[in-house]
Amino acid sequence: MEFSSPSREECPKPSGRVSIMAGSLTGLLLLQAVSWASGARPCIPKSFGYSSVVCVCNATYCDSFDPPTFPALGTFSRYESTRSGRRMELSMGTIQANHTGTGLLLTLQPEQKFQKVKGFGGAMTDAAALNILALSPPAQNLLLKSYFSEEGIGYNIIRVPMASCDFSIRTYTYADTPDDFQLHNFSLPEEDTKLKIPLIHRALQLAQRPVSLLASPWTSPTWLKTNGAVNGKGSLKGQPGDIYHQTWARYFVKFLDAYAEHKLQFWAVTAENEPSAGLLSGYPFQCLGFTPEHQRDFIARDLGPTLANSTHHNVRLLMLDDQRLLLPHWAKVVLTDPEAAKYVHGIAVHWYLDFLAPAKATLGETHRLFPNTMLFASEACVGSKFWEQSVRLGSWDRGMQYSHSIITNLLYHVVGWTDWNLALNPEGGPNWVRNFVDSPIIVDITKDTFYKQPMFYHLGHFSKFIPEGSQRVGLVASQKNDLDAVALMHPDGSAVVVVLNRSSKDVPLTIKDPAVGFLETISPGYSIHTYLWRRQ
């Protein structure tokens, strides 16, 4: 498929919200509009002058959805979001026995099986927790429901920073007493006990699906570091296998122990958030530098054995947790060493330099070399680059950047995709170094209101409809086109296809499933759709 450039931001034209049938569908297929059912509430749109709208939520109202609908055999569900203001609106269609369309044909190839999906989610940073808890309790609950419940978009991944990061309001670790090599003074501060942990428990209670927790450290205690500071160029003192590295490895176990005391178990930890950052002079916020060779030896001699010999031996270890530009080199260094490789379950990647690193040459090549090591996208956000505005309320372009990234990652063997902060304030913070960025949910505490951005719904087109255990399958286009598309099978054998149109042109479209027939539809300009149907 060919990828078109993202559109220039323009102010939206108001759209009616009564029927979801686009006028351009006439003559192809009349998709039957589905009225808002008892559990579903429509978006209350608000424009801030960017290319689309946000949906406004407060203590008494928030848009919501019914659980995903799999209609009777021979029909399909279609969920639509558009730049003009539709937000995951449901319609139903009939699967045709014969192909009558003349446009693009996407053919499902269920016999071509690829990776199984782990899931989708976001990070419970200190900043996210502060913003959520600044709302009134009813508004807090609606925000958490929006992300984690069946009424929302069904997140099943939460990334948790181990101690502070830039999205904290102070710098701290869990062991700031100098030379405490036995970690006797290791303790969780109120950021964990009063903010993150209670919110994570509330999210787990709301979720219908099992939620997996992923932990990542930004910096070690400063007394373990060569530069004696949380930020800037610095790595662990000494060499792998020594007291500094062993202490840092045991810090991971102490963290897992402490959260277990609060009845929270982790699916995975990453060896270090962005290990390349701590190799850069003047790096502005929390970091800990590792070269690939240093990470290899730390995993082989310290972190891997320490986790394996602890009560947390089932916790998965993910390497890298940095830009995919570093692949496949970083993977080659670590995974060609059998002592390190035996402890590594997966490779975590961040999205920030993706424009410099084609997916095929990085993700694709890494999968070719190490097909049994999973790839997992662990962090993404927009607004972080110096030329970008931090927050653009209602930006459709930023939503398209998310869904384009998710589809590309899925097409190159990645098993999950994790957003950064679950919620930020209108400035894009708080952040102790003022590294403000955007978020799918922006909280305005002055109004006890939060805004669900296009990014939220673009993510929802995947997270709500692709449960853990779904498997990507083949999908072949009949001609070059400007759409991004991916197909998956649910564990029960039903099908899901997500189609993103980043161009201004409407694209007539047929999806062919050899088992059931043809789905005649259209992909309007600047839209994203999720299609669901039963195959038996």
Curated annotation (Swiss-Prot):
Task: Please report the record's description of how this protein sits within the membrane.
Answer: Peripheral membrane protein
User: Does this entry carry the keyword Lipid metabolism?
Assistant: yes
Compartment(s) of residence: Lysosome membrane
Question: Glycans attached where?
Answer: N58, N98, N185, N309, N501
For this record, an example GO cellular component is: trans-Golgi network
Recite the UniProt keywords alphabetically: Cholesterol metabolism, Disulfide bond, Glycoprotein, Glycosidase, Glycosyltransferase, Hydrolase, Lipid metabolism, Lysosome, Membrane, Signal, Sphingolipid metabolism, Steroid metabolism, Sterol metabolism, Transferase
User: What are the cysteine partners in each disulfide bond?
Assistant: C43-C55, C57-C62
Q: What is one process in the GO biological process aspect for this record?
A: sphingosine biosynthetic process
Instruction: Enumerate the active-site residues.
Output: E274, E379
In its UniProt record, a GO molecular function of this protein is: glucosyltransferase activity
EC number(s) on file: 3.2.1.45, 2.4.1.-, 3.2.1.-, 3.2.1.46
The pathway noted for it is: Steroid metabolism; cholesterol metabolism; Sphingolipid metabolism
Report the function annotation for this chain.
Glucosylceramidase that catalyzes, within the lysosomal compartment, the hydrolysis of glucosylceramides/GlcCers (such as beta-D-glucosyl-(1<->1')-N-acylsphing-4-enine) into free ceramides (such as N-acylsphing-4-enine) and glucose. Plays a central role in the degradation of complex lipids and the turnover of cellular membranes. Through the production of ceramides, participates in the PKC-activated salvage pathway of ceramide formation. Catalyzes the glucosylation of cholesterol, through a transglucosylation reaction where glucose is transferred from GlcCer to cholesterol.
Concerning its family, UniProt says:
Belongs to the glycosyl hydrolase 30 family.
Q: What is this protein called?
A: Lysosomal acid glucosylceramidase
Biological source species: Pan troglodytes
Provide the organism lineage as a comma list. Answer: Eukaryota, Metazoa, Chordata, Craniata, Vertebrata
